[in-house]
């Protein structure tokens, strides 16, 4: 908490500026949902359940999951791995949904979509976000 207080207390910190900018410019319901999902679901209750499951199963249960819904990408960034793998590697909607559902049972509510370019599958990701609206 000391680090968080230090960052939030410094008005010149870029992270503090971004947080305040988000509160000023985003719809209040969006901010509320993100704070609840990240702070409560992922942070408080989720982390507690993750710790319990680490002890119960005797293995590392992560707090966050990085998922690559697709290797497809329309950006062609220099040095990026996605161009080497082509556009055909995709997790199905059922596989993505199953990963999130099973992760939530372990206490994981924080997901980072990587890839390729995840927004190539924007419709699918939005469907997952609506179904799993307690995740960040």
PLM features: residue spans?
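Conserved alpha-helical substructure of the radical SAM core
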Residues: 1-135
